[in-house]
Amino acid sequence: MTSEITYAEVRFKNEFKSSGINTASSAASKERTAPHKSNTGFPKLLCASLLIFFLLLAISFFIAFVIFFQKYSQLLEKKTTKELVHTTLECVKKNMPVEETAWSCCPKNWKSFSSNCYFISTESASWQDSEKDCARMEAHLLVINTQEEQDFIFQNLQEESAYFVGLSDPEGQRHWQWVDQTPYNESSTFWHPREPSDPNERCVVLNFRKSPKRWGWNDVNCLGPQRSVCEMMKIHL
């Protein structure tokens, strides 16, 4: 009886020791496999980040394309409108390399000088209506920048008429302004002697005086009907 008890105790102790070894082995195994699980999660996170990056990049390219297409459509529409306003053009080929073709054009019945086109009206209207007429032709009233430009214009005018230009004094304070916002330069003006002479005359015409014989600028009432000169940039094809 005594030997049986001893055997049972020994067996129990051995089983306990064996169980302890298995438990320790299992814990060690879990510790070894834990880093392996964290490593497998990193590639997934990297793939997800790259996917989001390329998705955002694709969206950015799409938005940029849409904006570009809209602007291109607006420019094309503007060019088409201008071509419809001036259905007939008179063009001169520019000096360009052989592989390039470029034409500088003015609408039919307009005068060409340097980089601009000029239309000399035969109808009389107020200064404001004259500017509106120019705007309907995608132009504005004449802005004189050089003596050469003015001399060219004078050669195409009739001495018995006066012609509105794009210079005015809206407030009557002798603060002259060009319609295209070109700064008014006192040293580059071509007023007749003793002009401008009346603060109530707020618009400017080109007219010819016989004494002395010369063309020049004269301030006049803006409502009085006069002929006019329109100006626009040349159209390049």
Swiss-Prot record:
Under CDD domains, the record lists: CLECT_DC-SIGN_like (cd03590)
Q: Per its UniProt record, what Gene3D superfamilies does this chain match?
A: Mannose-Binding Protein A, subunit A
Q: Which PROSITE patterns match?
A: C_TYPE_LECTIN_1, C_TYPE_LECTIN_2
The UniProt entry annotates the motif ITIM motif at: 5-10
Q: How does it sit in the membrane?
A: Single-pass type II membrane protein
| Main location per the UniProt record | membrane
The name under which this protein is listed is C-type lectin domain family 4 member A
Give this protein's Gene Ontology molecular function annotations.
Answer: calcium ion binding; carbohydrate binding; D-mannose binding; pattern recognition receptor activity; transmembrane signaling receptor activity
Protein's cellular compartments = Cell membrane
Q: Which residues are glycosylated?
A: N185
State the species of origin.
Answer: Homo sapiens (Human)
Keyword Hydrolase listed: no
Q: What induces it?
A: TNF alpha, IL-1 alpha, and LPS, down-regulated expression at the surface of neutrophils (at protein level). Expression is decreased in dendritic cells by signals inducing their maturation (e.g. CD40 ligand, TLR9 ligands, LPS, and TNF alpha). Isoform 2: mRNA expression is up-regulated by agonists of neutrophils CSF2/GM-CSF, IL3/interleukin-3, IL4/interleukin-4 and IL13/interleukin-13.
Q: List the disulfide bonds.
A: C106-C117, C134-C230, C203-C222
Q: Taxonomy-wise, where does this protein's organism fall, top ranks first?
A: Eukaryota, Metazoa, Chordata, Craniata, Vertebrata
Give expression by tissue.
Expressed preferentially in hematopoietic tissues. Expressed in all circulating Ag-presenting cells such as dendritic cells, myeloid cells, monocytes, macrophages, B-cells and epidermal Langerhans cells (at protein level). Expressed in peripheral blood leukocytes, neutrophils, moderate quantities in spleen, lymph node, and bone marrow, and at very low levels in thymus.
One GO biological process from the UniProt record? negative regulation of tumor necrosis factor production
- Summarize the protein's role: C-type lectin receptor that binds carbohydrates mannose and fucose but also weakly interacts with N-acetylglucosamine (GlcNAc) in a Ca(2+)-dependent manner. Involved in regulating immune reactivity. Once triggered by antigen, it is internalized by clathrin-dependent endocytosis and delivers its antigenic cargo into the antigen presentation pathway resulting in cross-priming of CD8(+) T cells. This cross-presentation and cross-priming are enhanced by TLR7 and TLR8 agonists with increased expansion of the CD8(+) T cells, high production of IFNG and TNF with reduced levels of IL4, IL5 and IL13. (Microbial infection) Involved in the interaction between HIV-1 virus and dendritic cells. Enhances HIV-1 binding/entry and virus infection. Requires ITIM motif-associated signal transduction pathway involving phosphatases PTPN6 and PTPN11, SYK, Src kinases and MAP kinases.
